[in-house]
Amino acid sequence: MSNKKLILKLFICSTIFITFVFALHDKRVVAASSVNELENWSKWMQPIPDNIPLARISIPGTHDSGTFKLQNPIKQVWGMTQEYDFRYQMDHGARIFDIRGRLTDDNTIVLHHGPLYLYVTLHEFINEAKQFLKDNPSETIIMSLKKEYEDMKGAEGSFSSTFEKNYFVDPIFLKTEGNIKLGDARGKIVLLKRYSGSNESGGYNNFYWPDNETFTTTVNQNVNVTVQDKYKVNYDEKVKSIKDTMDETMNNSEDLNHLYINFTSLSSGGTAWNSPYYYASYINPEIANDIKQKNPTRVGWVIQDYINEKWSPLLYQEVIRANKSLIKE
């Protein structure tokens, strides 16, 4: 009788142990699978919990996102910062888009880089973003909008009123503010307003954006924002500014109410040897390698020139991988 009881106890214990081992294995498989989902670049936001603020997520973006249609070699040296279209940028992980516009005489907004017309309209960008979000509803698109050049003669109204009456009314735009969480932003375009005269709420408002500086400001009442946007400096100063801001971001990784925006772009000197492309070919892999070596839990919003697959390690991929700490096991 005692032998039977002993055998029964051993059987029960072994069953419990095997169940525990399989449960632990399944948990690890699920966790590993979730982390691996970060590397599906068109859907990398999917495994990140809904309650995480966008300000806390490390997000890659593109500087002067609409310059990819420039064909003239001289204009390319001066003004081209992206070689691939919006959908390519989105499919390769970019979720922040630096959109700069001009109001036309038919009261539409077209994209500009300084005085350069980019042969792209704001409608084109919004439609591309809508299609991408329809295909990938787990994602969000952050659209930074700035008035880049004086209105055309004959334009009626203002840049801000035209945008808000003719574009922002689209339900694709998130109309809430505050410290926006990913769950509220999925499937939406989140507006970051770099233009003045706004009468509408929604997105990130009231930006004070001094030129060629690193600065800290407050938006949406209680969200602190540090921006590094030095673009008219020498190469060494630029790289130092990027790394200093990134180090501050890493050291402040648990502050959910502080957003860090870090531009890696440098303005053109007018030749092939000091063009945005030339600078990006060195800066992008250097910053990517710095992230890879430090293995941080947060690097902020990193806005780059020339998102592509040319210069290893790839900056946008290292930025996205910094989010692995946000994925719950």
Swiss-Prot record:
GO molecular function: phosphatidylinositol diacylglycerol-lyase activity; phosphoric diester hydrolase activity
Reaction equation(s) it catalyzes: a 1,2-diacyl-sn-glycero-3-phospho-(1D-myo-inositol) = 1D-myo-inositol 1,2-cyclic phosphate + a 1,2-diacyl-sn-glycerol
Enzyme class: lyase
Main location: secreted
Cited CDD domains: PI-PLCc
Gene Ontology terms: cellular component: extracellular region
Annotated PI-PLC X-box domain residues: 51-194
GO biological process: lipid catabolic process
Keywords of this entry: Lipid degradation, Lipid metabolism, Lyase, Secreted, Signal
Pfam families given in the database record: PI-PLC-X
Annotated compartments: Secreted
InterPro entries from the UniProt entry: PI-PLC_domain (IPR051057), PLC-like_Pdiesterase_TIM-brl (IPR017946), PLipase_C_PInositol-sp_X_dom (IPR000909)
TM ranges: none
Functional description taken from the UniProt entry: Cleaves glycosylphosphatidylinositol (GPI) and phosphatidylinositol (PI) anchors but not PI phosphates.
Protein name: 1-phosphatidylinositol phosphodiesterase
Species of the source: Bacillus thuringiensis
Top-level taxonomy: Bacteria, Bacillati, Bacillota, Bacilli, Bacillales
